[in-house]
Amino acid sequence: MTAVEGSSLTALNKGRLFASFDVDAFEVPGGRDEIWRFTPLRRLRGLHDGSAVANGKVHIRVSQQSGVQTEIVGRGDGRLGQGGIPTDRVAAQAFSSFQSATVVTVGRDMQIATPINIAVTGPDKGAVVYGHLQIRVCKFGEAVVVIDHRGSGTYADNVEFIVEAAARLTVVWIADWADDMVHLSAHHALLGKDAVLRHITVTLGGEVVRVSANVRFSGPGGDAELLGLYFADDGQHLESRLLVDHAHPDCKSNVLYKGALQGDPVSSRPDAHTVWVGDVLIHPEATGTDTFEVNRNLVLTNGVRADSVPNLEIETDEIVGAGHASATGRFDDEQLFYLRSRGIGEEQARRLLVRGFFGEIISKIAVPQVRERLIAAIEHELTITESRSTAS
């Protein structure tokens, strides 16, 4: 679904979204609105209706490296918004309300050997803040960026990834918030000619975390890979919404998201709930497009819900390939039986299957410390699963 600045919603087809920097151009979301129908609006603490007034501060720390420039800029900086236009009211509210933005620029021809680490600390419990972050990789540059979120509070932000011609950016976006955090994040990626983006989202913590990622190509030959890993526990709502907008020839996109869910039979909190919505639009002029998207969800216990909605809209016959797949279910009984027949205990067999399920994503993360951290986090969640099973 491509974003159309200032257009009427009624004039748009299924593959196009209204977009505006003006929060008043959007109606207050309701439960029947397509882009909000899975989101628990009552748990957003007013981020969606304008009643959440900023009263805190988010802390952003960027590691310093040669060839990388970090700036704190005001609202009037002309670079802000070049990556994309807000397509929902919360993103527009965040764009209208942030006080300063962090801009990280990788210079032309710069090959950054070690990851750029960006630590984002929440405003603290009871506080509300709006933010803006832009990552730009100039022509022929290359970088790996890890954006790590921790802490508490209520937060809405826009994050821009601008990858200029023949540049390469790998970004690992991690939400490891405290259990009380509400975070709505809109990601806007713009790829130049022959640019490459690897966008990986990892969602582990938080009460409500919703990430909306829009990817656009501004020239031919772009290559975007969007990977996601999420593990939802009791009381969590984790939502991922993707749009890959193909409007230029010979571009590629590959989407693979995997999630696991577990509940707590004695808890009074809402059931664990994950949402994945993947939209791909191929315009008439986007000949030679090659795209595929997959979402898999592994249900570990009762008391959970996983919604998965892939959408593919093709407006030209001259493509290399396009497809999507989605599946939600429990452990494969045949795989479990095979491991048990080899003398492996049931708990260990389940652990091995979950490790294998997520291994396809984890193996593609180019930062060893992040891989190790994710493996440890998954092991911790599985320990919780086993302890609840034993208690019941």
Swiss-Prot record:
Q: Which Pfam families does this chain map to?
A: SUFBD_core
- InterPro entries, alphabetically? Fe-S_cluster_assembly_SufBD, SUF_FeS_clus_asmbl_SufBD_core, SUF_FeS_clus_asmbl_SufBD_sf, SUF_FeS_clus_asmbl_SufD
Gene Ontology biological-process entries? iron-sulfur cluster assembly
Q: Which PANTHER family match?
A: PROTEIN ABCI7, CHLOROPLASTIC
Q: Which family does it belong to?
A: Belongs to the iron-sulfur cluster assembly SufBD family.
Name recorded for this polypeptide:
Iron-sulfur cluster assembly SufBD family protein ML0594
